[in-house]
Design a protein with these regions (language model features):
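A preference for well-ordered globular domain cores
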Residues: 1-150
C-alpha cells in the first residue's frame, strides 16, 4: 500500500530545498515515489511500501498525511498524474466506443429504465458490452490511483 506524506518546500535566495526521493526500486523498478501536487504551499508525495526514503534536508519537516475524503478529492483534482489517468481512461473507452455511442447507450438505457423504450434486437447485449468495457476502464483508473495512495 502506498502512503502519502507532506512537507513545505523551503526557498533560499539561490535554491529551492525539496524532499530527496530515492531512485526507482523493486525487481523491475516499479516502486518509486511520486510528487502528487502542491496545495496552499504544502507538497504531497506518494511513497509506496517497500521504499526507504533517503536522509532528508534538515530544513524540511516531512509528516505522514491523514487522508480525509476532502483532501483526497483536492489532491486528485490538482495532481497531473490523476489528470493523466483520467485521460487514459477516456482513451481506453474511446478506442472502442465514440462519444455518440455513449450518448446512444445513455438514451436507450434511461428510456428502458423509465419504461418509455423497449430494446431492439441486440441492443441489450450491446449496452451490456459497453457497460462492461467502461467499467473495466474505470477499474483500471481506480487501480492506478490506488498505486498513488488515492
Amino acid at each position: 500500500m502506498t502512503s502519502i506524506c507532506s512537507y513545505r518546500k523551503v526557498s533560499t535566495p539561490h535554491t529551492v530545498i525539496q524532499m530527496s526521493l530515492p531512485d526507482s526500486m523493486g525487481a523491475h523498478d516499479e516502486l518509486h515515489c511520486t510528487e502528487l501536487c502542491t496545495l496552499d504551499g504544502v507538497t504531497y508525495v506518494a511513497v509506496p511500501d517497500g521504499v526507504t526514503l533517503p536522509d532528508q534536508p534538515p530544513e524540511l519537516a516531512i509528516a505522514p498525511v491523514v487522508l480525509t475524503p476532502e483532501l483526497r478529492e483536492q489532491i486528485k483534482a490538482a495532481s497531473p498524474h490523476c489528470s493523466l489517468i483520467a485521460e487514459r481512461m477516456e482513451t481506453r473507452i474511446r478506442a472502442r466506443y465514440s462519444q455518440s455511442d455513449e450518448q446512444y447507450f445513455a438514451r436507450i438505457g434511461v428510456g428502458v429504465a423509465l419504461g418509455s423504450y423497449t430494446f431492439e434486437p441486440g441492443e441489450q447485449d450491446a449496452l451490456i458490452a459497453f457497460g462492461a468495457h467502461v467499467e473495466a476502464a474505470r477499474q483500471w483508473g481506480r487501480s492506478e490511483r490506488e498505486k498513488l495512495g488515492l
